[in-house]
Amino acid sequence: MPTPSPSPRLGRRGFLALAGGTLLAAAGCAPQTTNAAHSEPAGELPTGPPPAGTSLAVAVRTSQIQLAASGLDKNLPFKVSSWINLNAGPDIIQGFRARSIDVASNAGIPPIQAEAIGVKARIVAVQERHHPTYTFATAPASSIRTAEDFKGKKIAFSQGQAQGVVVLRALKKAGLANSDVQLVALPSTQFLTALQSKQVDVAPLGEPTLTKYLTQYGKDGARGVPTDVVDLLTVLWAPLEVLNDPAKAAAVRSYVTLWAQGVAWAWDNSDQWIDAYYVKDQGVSAADGRRIVDSLAKPRFPANWDNAIAWEQETADLMAEGGFVPKLDVKTLFDRRFEGLAAAAVPAGFRAGA
């Protein structure tokens, strides 16, 4: 399959090529769909602690730091065999396929991507974010100031990650069709280089990457273009094979509660969180860390996943309309045996609707 090139409209083959690369090479001719009877977690969710010796490989860098800084890591009832410092959706999917990652955190789009290429995994926890988390950054000396100015411009577009859906939603809200712009297929790890070299005119960046970029290139005319586009979901998800292992499923159940408690701790102890994560891990100043944290909305964990499923369906439909993935009923992506566990683990003020 050829590497996708910049195009006004990237189709399903382009999406799958970008989503895969080495992933699709490993996938071979993996089927696009499978029989649902063989695709659902088996049995009731274990309620007790995981058996002694149970381990998980966890790809949630922020959680590693939150649990260590808060002391919650002492409550882990299983061994973390490795904390894997990966977060891009395609990398996580490759890790799932290679059986090197047991649980990870991403936005809502990677589970859709995984299903599209036959990698079976399920969502086990949901966090909602009712505030924009991405800002469109322009290349140096750009004239772009609003989303309407995107017409005719080159936009960095990673279809298999949250940033890709943010682009599609921003275009739709600005009254622009995908064909009104040039969608340049790039993984998000290449967005900064593409902006710096003016390979693209604009790219969606999250924090602290946005702050680092504007600190370096703001003097050259780079700027942030905010929109009100929300990327609602942060999810924990795990391969179906992991969830069908009773010992590992019990460990995932335990981790869901600690993950949520770590997120809540970071909100309630922002000075410690800024120092541990933004300053010591991400290399930004304490002042920039404070500005970033103050710009965020309070994390919320829904006890009921109906709203999350509706949002995920809207995302899947948007991707299907663009020809990037086959149509999908996203209800199959959620393992509702875990529904409400994260919400029950945090104070009432962190629950959706509070």
Regions found by a protein language model. Name each.
Residues 245-326:
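Secondary-structure end/capping motifs
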Residues 317-354:
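Conserved C-terminal helix/tail region of periplasmic/extracytoplasmic solute-binding proteins
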Residues 109, 190-281:
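Pocket-lining segment of extracytoplasmic ligand-binding domains
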Residues 35-177, 182-185, 201-207, 228-230:
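Short, glycine-/small- and polar/acidic-enriched structural segments
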Residues 30-32:
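Bacterial signal peptide processing site
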Residues 94, 98, 112, 148, ...:
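Solvent-exposed, polar/charged alpha-helical surfaces in well-ordered, non-transmembrane soluble domains
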